[in-house]
């Protein structure tokens, strides 16, 4: 119920029109797992980063903000995990990696090429498990982190 209310409020936020529209479009598309790789690659090819983020968020049951942070982080480890969690194949991940490296000079295409085997070695199930806390509400995630820190102290 809380998530539905937050989505409803986000849809009415004037400052987030593009993001809200991308989320609505991704929901309307309702990409099936076999359609997702092509849609993600095509959205980046068309320079529709907001749609790419929304499609990824929907596929992984993440908030748009979490998915955006993952995609825009120049250290792309979480992105590669997210793409594996969505069960993307080598060709799709390579196309996405190349597109992001071409668009952002901070991303190193040679380093990405060196990582592709390691990326593909991670199973989709292991990637989903590694990212599982990201689908939780941000306040709940923060509370979990505080508990973990308190236990370590």
Q: What feature does the model see in each segment?
A:
Residues 1-153:
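Alpha-helical scaffold segments
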């Amino acid at each position: 119920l809380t998530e539905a209310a937050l989505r409803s409020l986000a849809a009415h936020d004037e400052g987030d029109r593009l993001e809200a529209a991308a989320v609505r479009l991704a929901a309307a598309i309702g990409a099936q797992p076999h359609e997702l790789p092509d849609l993600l690659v095509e959205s980046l090819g068309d320079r529709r980063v907001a749609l790419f983020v929304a499609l990824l968020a929907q596929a992984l049951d993440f908030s748009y903000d979490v998915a955006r942070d993952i995609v825009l982080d120049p250290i792309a480890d979480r992105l590669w995990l997210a793409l594996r969690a969505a069960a993307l194949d080598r060709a799709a991940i390579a196309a996405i990696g190349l597109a992001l490296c071409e668009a952002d000079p901070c991303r190193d295409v040679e380093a990405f090429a060196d990582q592709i085997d390691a990326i593909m070695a991670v199973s989709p199930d292991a990637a989903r498990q590694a990212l599982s806390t990201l689908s939780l509400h941000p306040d709940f995630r923060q509370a979990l982190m505080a508990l973990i820190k308190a236990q370590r102290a």
